[in-house]
């Protein structure tokens, strides 16, 4: 998500930090900032909302006025992707303590920031921003001046780290200790660059690849103290018994800058597919507490949720497919009727809306023109509108009554991947919140469903680890002119999404069908050697859909088609009928799409690459569709 850089050494930090921020612009951001510490104990912070050019203009203005404060050989930099607080100058990083002595930059979410902020405010601390980040710098300042580690900057940071909950990377610098940077990570990435008489720290190696190729990747719940002469890695308690190779990884970077931005992958899309475990985990983070779904930021009370008597979901493209999946979950958990509508069609058919209607508008960018117009139409009919969006401060959340942000981070590839899985997770959170408020699920039932959802990131990692065979299948079927996708129940929207991905990336004719419709026309398309990809329901499915889809597969094979079947790993009955079998872990029916989608993403990217197309920038498509 956010881009972080830190430098301590013998050269002027300003240009090094700004250049590093420029190299990390590919990550996406809505504001940028820099903190510089000079040898005289001065800390200067400059930050601006908008593009990096805005920050550079501010730095140039400082130069023209007096030029003071922008020297020094220790610096921090940050490009922000907003999660707490709107994208404004005051919410941009770095943040400082009240005395202006300590600066911090942060990526991730401090889950327990609300009670920590209340504690600090009760002690008289005044906050200058709406962010969770500012809590960390005030806690360190108090620990440094009043705590049992007073006067010891690194020890004060470690003491505070032990109080923080969530997923985060934090990097601190202090004017009282100008040659030192203290950094830490929990779940979000952090790498060090080892130079000659200088050290770097960053969200990824793009931050320092022009200066050094020797790097260290920190492990989970580890901190590092950096000086120009070297580094010391500890756990959050300060223990330094850690060993390279076992607890953290030392490596040499062989990539060029272009590859570094993509994390060593050939395309951003492949990198983003690999980031799906963290996209889902981050979207769920902080939304379950004391056996309850907690959606504080969405701004709809339990009473308002109880008054809902029908739900409409409006979206376009991949987001529409996530809405189709949400229908199954919300209806099952809440017993509310749910309609899913293409946003481009919604307002042209005079849908029946009123004050008891909840309209869920799903948009990755928050700027999708058709979805925005659907939101405006719903508002004129007095319906309540909940936006599910990946971009803080965008137009759709601003006009909606409530918002639930996915936390997938910037998605550079035009074809949606990690934002799709994050949308599914967010949709399911809404469904569980509705069930909880309406009493259609007991608290222990809500908790059980959430715990299975919470377990999905680890299962997604397992699926990703087995994708080599899918890449090989993509090579084999790249010359095909048509591919069909079949599914039942939640497998049907997955089939639609698989077909869309293949159209977008490989410019190939692809269609997704509900398998029960096969006899009603699509079976006429089946001929010799046609690839048909089948998303198999669980053999434990109570509706007997597994047996019905087995029958469909036999019909397809009888006509000479080649079957590629995505099935759960304990599904032995499907093996004789699959020409190619892709196995995924066994999960409850509603959660299977979070796993079965992944092979289809990898397949589409592989076919596109084999056909010589740009996976990240398919022709005629844009990431954000801002015209109707």
From Swiss-Prot:
The keyword Repeat applies. Keywords: Aminotransferase, Cytoplasm, Glutamine amidotransferase, Repeat, Transferase. Residues 301-440, 473-618 form the SIS domain. The active site is at 2 (nucleophile), 623 (for fru-6p isomerization activity). One of its GO terms (biological process) is carbohydrate metabolic process. It holds the Pfam family GATase_6. Residues 61-94 are annotated as: Disordered. It catalyses: D-fructose 6-phosphate + L-glutamine = D-glucosamine 6-phosphate + L-glutamate. Its main location: cytoplasm. The keyword Transmembrane helix does not apply. Homodimer. This is Glutamine--fructose-6-phosphate aminotransferase [isomerizing]. The gene is glmS.
